[in-house]
């Protein structure tokens, strides 16, 4: 079942895949990494002017990585606001997704956190570097295949 945004994108020949609706009835779409930046600009012009959140997750050990964007269309006098969830999947061997920092500035720290925890490179992001872990940290802590380094635990000292 397609939602109104999916139908609107299809009429304009914009390639995407409808993933249905979540438990709150919010439409979820899958966009290919190579199409994401242009579709993001179109969505912004269409009225999705607020990026509520961006996150990323590891789909499965050895599998794909996903970057998830929750967008809201806020218009004066329109209640409730329209929402959409966009998922962009990428291969873990070379995880690259175009940054949408220049479309929604609020994604700055969120894309940096996704880079820091999962190693997804957001192309054209102006300050893509670690934000939570030290620069010297090796690996991507939230990947399912991540092997945690052995640390000396305080409780072992007693």
Curated annotation (Swiss-Prot):
Pfam families referenced in this protein's UniProt entry, alphabetically: Complex1_30kDa (PF00329)
UniProt main location, coarse: plastid
Subcellular localization: Plastid, Chloroplast thylakoid membrane
Subunit structure: NDH is composed of at least 16 different subunits, 5 of which are encoded in the nucleus.
NCBIfam families in UniProt: PRK12494.1
Full protein name: NAD(P)H-quinone oxidoreductase subunit J, chloroplastic
Family the entry assigns: Belongs to the complex I 30 kDa subunit family.
Entry's EC annotation: 7.1.1.-
Principal EC category: translocase
Gene name per UniProt: ndhJ
Top-rank taxon: Eukaryota
């Amino acid at each position: 079942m397609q939602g109104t945004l999916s139908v609107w994108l299809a009429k304009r020949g914009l390639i995407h895949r409808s993933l249905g609706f979540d438990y709150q009835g919010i439409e979820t779409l899958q966009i290919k990494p190579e199409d994401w930046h242009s579709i993001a600009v179109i969505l912004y012009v269409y009225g999705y002017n607020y990026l509520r959140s961006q996150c990323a997750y590891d789909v499965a050990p050895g599998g794909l990585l996903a970057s998830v964007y929750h967008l809201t269309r806020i218009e004066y006098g329109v209640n409730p606001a329209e929402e959409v969830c966009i998922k962009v999947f990428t291969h873990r061997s070379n995880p690259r997704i175009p940054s949408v920092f220049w479309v929604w500035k609020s994604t700055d720290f969120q894309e940096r956190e996704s880079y820091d925890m999962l190693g997804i490179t957001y192309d054209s992001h102006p300050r893509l570097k670690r934000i939570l872990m030290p620069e010297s940290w090796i690996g991507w802590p939230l990947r399912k295949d991540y092997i945690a380094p052995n640390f000396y635990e305080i409780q072992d000292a007693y």
